[in-house]
């Protein structure tokens, strides 16, 4: 008899697009069966707590308490979940897209004659073995075993499981039992949960809570990454790591992948490709390609037919030496992996004392035998988050300590190579000192010039100075350039270039000429630094005119000026200024405490001549040699 006196709905012959979308939502959503009300009534709960619980009744027509069904009257994802997940109907089965089913069709559905997978998990009639702790022995998990709450295959979902300790010994997801515990509304931790299969006592609530807490520690950050990130797979063209969005894999080359942008630019166009959008999807052959790609394939491949890509043919397994290089850990008596809830997520069995575990780059831990068999014979990626273990583009190889290492992408290496070296810029000249050590000032070699007071070390290092961006100033031997420099020097140093006897400025000033290439500079003893503080004009004199002031370390020039401040002229022994026709030479010595020397200017009272104090270092000498002008 039909429920509520409703008429039998019209039979549908084809699956509509809207219903197909609802089926996709049902298969991709996390829906849990909290309670079964009779043979055709089901209380469901979604993972999002704000959506609440929904009641589904199968009949003619089907009913659901969700807003989507109440508004449209069409099959919602909750009804589709019961038909596809609970009763294992194929998506294209006639009973899967009808608005209602007759009594005969419902009886066939309950008997499972349409199921394409193994029948649902039931309590075994065999006598369960009792362990020493009083609990039943956990049953082994087979390939077709499913969780009675989420209806997912246990070995495919790879989530930690618990088992019924007092009734049947069957396995259930720990997460699902935690959700069921919230629905049963147990009063205290000492209460016992009911088994969703045998309806007997399942396990104490405190045991489930401890297992749930520990099992959450097995979840890594990589599992929470978006599925459109292909972890561990770099683009062989642009070195993007990981590839995001659609990923393309060459069907002929070993581990050759391209991102969407590089694939569209016709990179590696001579071979056929397979693609996937998410890392948990299968690779599918790329059939529809642009006209440019078709033309290139026709020209390069000749009579080769792309065909459908078979994943087994293009499967690449992890090399044996890479598997052996992964860290190997032995479980000790005090290991945390012995706590309830910790287990290998491949075989879903607990860890035991003395066993060996392998640690993957994504920090997942497995039994050594389980993960070795997986990597060597099944797949080259982690079975949980699908992160690729070995890729020739980023793998460095086996380290001497047995640890596995990975290289950074070539893009990162290129960025490191492009880092600028430290530079010391001398204002106004365009000379740039490039070197690995900071604070080393150059000493320009002297040609045909006289040396007065210099402190040099024969073991001083040599460095190269490059000419960089001289702008309008060009150092050569032309007379025009000498005149230009002479004019600029006369403007900057009108006092020092005057003839003391005549009081006139010479018509020409001869400046040193510097070669443009391979200028060898003698540095200080190690790394002297100079701060020309509070005296900008003095730095301009040194840079533009290549002039250096010689301060006598035995008796400073300032003391001599103070002694003869009433005299009208200075002795030539006290100050010897010379313009050198060769190249000016700058030599500095290092302070004992590696501090920076300072050149300070002390101005006298007008109209007296300004006094120039000695350099504030113990054994440093700064020389300015000018030749051709009599003071």
Curated annotation (Swiss-Prot):
> How would you describe the post-translational modification of this protein?
Polyubiquitinated. Polyubiquitination is followed by degradation via the proteasome.
Q: Which residues form a coiled coil?
A: none
Give positions of the RING-type zinc fingers.
147-199, 344-386
Chain intervals annotated as zinc finger (SWIM-type): 54-87
Q: Where does Zn(2+) 1 bind?
A: 235, 238, 259, 262
Q: Which UniProt keywords apply?
A: Apoptosis, Metal-binding, Repeat, Transferase, Ubl conjugation, Ubl conjugation pathway, Zinc, Zinc-finger
Q: What catalytic reaction does the record list?
A: S-ubiquitinyl-[E2 ubiquitin-conjugating enzyme]-L-cysteine + [acceptor protein]-L-lysine = [E2 ubiquitin-conjugating enzyme]-L-cysteine + N(6)-ubiquitinyl-[acceptor protein]-L-lysine
EC number(s) from the headed UniProt entry: 2.3.2.27
Comp. bias intervals (Basic residues)? 599-608
Q: Which residues bind Zn(2+) 2?
A: 250, 253, 268, 271
Q: Which GO terms describe its biological process?
A: apoptotic process; positive regulation of extrinsic apoptotic signaling pathway via death domain receptors; protein polyubiquitination
Gene Ontology terms, MF aspect: ubiquitin protein ligase activity; ubiquitin-protein transferase activity; zinc ion binding
Purpose: E3 ubiquitin-protein ligase involved in the regulation of Fas-, DR3- and DR4-mediated apoptosis. Functions in conjunction with the UBE2D1, UBE2D3 and UBE2E1 E2 ubiquitin-conjugating enzymes.
State whether it acts alone or in a complex, and with which partners, per the record.
Dimer. Interacts with UBE2D1.
Q: What is this protein called?
A: E3 ubiquitin-protein ligase Zswim2
The source organism is Mus musculus (Mouse)
**Which gene is transcribed and translated to give this protein?**
Zswim2
């Amino acid at each position: 008899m039909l429920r509520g006196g409703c008429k039998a709905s019209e039979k549908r012959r084809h699956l509509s697009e809207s219903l197909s979308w609802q089926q996709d939502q049902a298969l991709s959503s996390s829906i849990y069966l909290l309670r079964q009300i009779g043979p055709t009534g089901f209380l469901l709960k979604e993972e999002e707590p704000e959506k609440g619980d929904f009641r589904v009744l199968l009949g003619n027509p089907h009913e659901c308490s969700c807003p989507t069904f109440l508004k449209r009257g069409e099959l919602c994802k909750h009804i589709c979940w019961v038909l596809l997940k609970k009763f294992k109907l194929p998506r294209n089965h006639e009973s899967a897209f009808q608005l209602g089913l007759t009594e005969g069709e419902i009886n066939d559905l309950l008997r499972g004659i349409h199921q394409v997978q193994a029948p649902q998990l039931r309590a075994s009639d065999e006598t369960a073995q009792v362990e020493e702790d009083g609990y039943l022995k956990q049953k082994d998990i087979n390939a077709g075993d499913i969780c009675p709450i989420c209806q997912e295959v246990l070995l495919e979902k790879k989530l930690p499981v618990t088992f019924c300790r007092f009734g049947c010994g069957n396995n259930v997801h720990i997460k699902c039992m935690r959700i069921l515990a919230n629905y049963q509304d147990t009063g205290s931790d000492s209460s016992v949960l009911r088994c969703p299969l045998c309806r007997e006592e399942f396990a104490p609530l405190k045991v489930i809570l401890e297992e749930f807490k520990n099992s959450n520690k097995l979840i890594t950050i990589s599992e929470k990454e978006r599925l459109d990130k292909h972890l561990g797979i770099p683009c062989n063209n642009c070195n993007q790591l990981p590839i995001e969005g659609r990923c393309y894999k060459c069907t002929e080359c070993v581990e050759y992948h391209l991102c969407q942008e590089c694939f569209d630019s016709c990179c590696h166009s001579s071979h056929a490709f397979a693609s996937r959008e998410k890392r948990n999807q299968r690779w599918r052959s790329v059939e529809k390609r642009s006209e440019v790609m078709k033309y290139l394939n026709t020209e390069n491949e000749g009579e080769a037919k792309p065909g459908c890509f078979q994943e087994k043919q293009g499967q690449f397994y992890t090399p044996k030496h890479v598997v052996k290089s992964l860290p190997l850990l032995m479980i000790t008596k005090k290991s945390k992996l012995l706590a309830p809830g910790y287990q290998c997520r491949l075989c879903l069995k607990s860890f035991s004392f003395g066993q060996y575990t392998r640690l993957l780059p994504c920090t997942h831990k497995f039994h050594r035998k389980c993960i070795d068999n997986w990597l060597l014979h099944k797949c080259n990626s982690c079975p949980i988050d699908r992160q690729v273990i070995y890729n020739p583009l980023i793998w460095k190889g086996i380290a001497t300590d047995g640890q596995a290492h990975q290289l950074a992408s070539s893009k990162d290496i290129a960025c490191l190579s492009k880092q600028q070296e430290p530079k010391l810029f001398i204002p106004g000249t365009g000379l740039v000192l490039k070197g690995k050590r900071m604070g080393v000032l150059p000493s320009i070699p002297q040609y045909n010039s006289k040396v007065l007071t210099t402190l040099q070390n024969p073991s001083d290092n040599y460095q190269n100075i490059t000419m960089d961006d001289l702008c309008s100033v060009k150092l050569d031997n032309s007379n025009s350039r000498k005149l230009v420099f002479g004019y600029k020097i006369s403007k900057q140093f009108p006092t020092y270039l005057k003839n003391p006897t005549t009081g006139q400025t010479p018509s020409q000033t001869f400046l040193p000429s510097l070669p443009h290439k391979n200028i060898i500079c003698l540095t200080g003893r190690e790394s002297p630094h100079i701060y020309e503080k509070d005296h900008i004009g003095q730095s301009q004199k040194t840079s533009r005119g290549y002039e250096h002031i010689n301060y006598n370390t035995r008796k400073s020039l300032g003391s001599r000026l103070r002694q003869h401040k009433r005299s009208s002229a200075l002795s030539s022994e006290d100050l010897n200024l010379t313009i050198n026709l060769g190249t000016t030479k700058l030599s500095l010595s290092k302070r004992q405490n590696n501090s920076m020397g300072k050149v300070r200017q002390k101005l006298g009272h007008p109209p007296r001549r300004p006094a120039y104090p000695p350099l504030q270092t113990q054994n440093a000498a700064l020389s300015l040699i000018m030749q051709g002008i009599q003071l």
